[in-house]
């Protein structure tokens, strides 16, 4: 919908539409606050630092950060990537978005069936590494480009759920604080990735290499988080 509005009325109209939807949602929450929004006490700075201070938590947060740098940060410059592989910008964003929707709605079912959310995270990031590598290696293949765009959206949008599951499993008494910190790392990674990508413009190769490097660091951190979690608990905690 946003793409259609932007094409007909300009990008400012899309931003206005998003803002209008946000205002309606905020008004709805305000009117039904008592019955819809649970009362969750805010966490103190000490609680947040305690969560971050555990090695397995810190490594998990780093995973989220670096995947955010690579996946969401790269998405900021998707027109540059699409120009490299000679795919129409609107069509490419549709493919990416459909992949993202499939990933966001489908990852819960996958997570319910696997034994370890940490192993699932490693698998997702490994596939994301492969995806970015293929975009670099086959810049003139439309088939590779379309498949990789779909997979990029799917993998990027599905990466958060197993991460949040890992944080909840590792922090049963401070779950709300843990997932909030992890979510913040995702958006911080996106912002940092966007800033770094701007420095690499107009080189699409440089942007893709930067994204690839970020997710490679992410997979190393993910393996470290899994090992640290087992060491911390003495067993295979998800």
Give residue spans per PLM region.
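C-terminal transmembrane helical hairpin of 12-TM major facilitator-type secondary transporters
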Residues: 117-163
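Extracytoplasmic gate region of multi-pass secondary transporters
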Residues: 55-104
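Helix-to-loop junctions at the C-terminal end of transmembrane segments
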Residues: 6, 103-116, 201
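A late C-terminal transmembrane helix in Major Facilitator Superfamily
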Residues: 169-204, 210-213
């Amino acid at each position: 919908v946003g793409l259609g509005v932007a094409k007909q009325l300009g990008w400012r109209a899309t931003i206005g539409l998003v803002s209008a939807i946000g205002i309606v949602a905020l008004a709805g929450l305000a009117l039904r606050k008592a019955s819809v929004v649970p009362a969750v006490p805010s966490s103190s700075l000490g609680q947040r630092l305690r969560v971050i201070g555990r090695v397995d938590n810190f490594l998990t947060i780093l995973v989220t950060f670096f995947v955010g740098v690579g996946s969401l940060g790269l998405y900021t410059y998707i027109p540059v990537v699409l120009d490299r592989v000679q795919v129409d910008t609107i069509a490419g964003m549709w493919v990416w978005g459909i992949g993202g929707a499939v990933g966001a709605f489908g990852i819960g079912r996958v997570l319910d069936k696997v034994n370890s959310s940490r192993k699932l995270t490693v698998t997702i990031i490994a596939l994301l590494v492969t995806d970015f590598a293929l975009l670099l290696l086959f810049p003139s293949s439309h088939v590779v480009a379309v498949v990789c765009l779909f997979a990029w959206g799917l993998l990027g949008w599905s990466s958060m759920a197993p991460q949040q599951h890992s944080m909840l499993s590792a922090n049963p008494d401070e779950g709300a604080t843990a997932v909030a910190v992890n979510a913040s790392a995702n958006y911080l990674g996106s912002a940092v990735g966007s800033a770094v990508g701007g420095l690499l413009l107009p080189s699409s190769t440089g942007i893709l290499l930067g994204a690839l490097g970020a997710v490679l660091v992410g997979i190393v951190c993910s393996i470290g988080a899994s090992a640290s979690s087992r060491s911390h608990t003495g067993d295979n905690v998800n």
